[in-house]
Amino acid sequence: MLLGLHTYSLHLHGMGQNWGGFKLRWEPVWDIFGLMDEAKKLGLDGLHLTAADLGATDQEHLRDVRRAAEERGLFLEYNFSLDASEYDDRLTHTMEEGIAIAESIGSDIGKISMDVRRPHPVCGSAFHPEVIPQLEKIAVKALTAGPVAQNAGVRICLENHTEAFSDEVLWIINRVNHPYVGVCVDTNN
């Protein structure tokens, strides 16, 4: 078994994305390369990253990140959102953009927060009439992105996160029915 860490776990070190309306008041302790060095010191096998951790998403920088991870023997996973505008828009990508970044850093996983908007708190709103059209749009995006993901060798994983029910994620997966479109069930949220 490999042990990785989501950079949000180092939020108090200035790493990871802003979340829940909280914006960091201090600079990150490490850049992406220092973070990888720290991961090795901690005995980790890999990191689950966002664009906030990468610092930049231009191709030259992403190649440097990939090379640095390979030199350190670390796996990388890429985490992005379809619409993180409410808390940290640095994380917002189309599925195709997220797949391209994941491929560039050598990640075989692109974990996606779907960012479903609900008319009221999550409790009792599974498959709410205002949610179903959003799920359908995500399914269409995933249908289009599936072949792109397969060509890139990146499995995309739709996450339930804090705003989707597992049944809703499975509904999308069953509609898409593509070997490179899967699920990340977050049992902590």
Regions found by a protein language model. Name each.
Residues L5, L47-L49, I112, L158-N160, ...:
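Conserved beta-strand positions
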Residues M1-S107, V140, H178:
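N-terminal pre-domain/capping segments
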Residues L54-T57, A164, N189:
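Glycine-/small-residue-rich active-site loops that bind phosphorylated ligands and cofactors
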Residues V181-N189:
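Beta/alpha (TIM)-barrel catalytic core signal, keyed to glycine-rich beta->alpha loops juxtaposed to Asp/Glu
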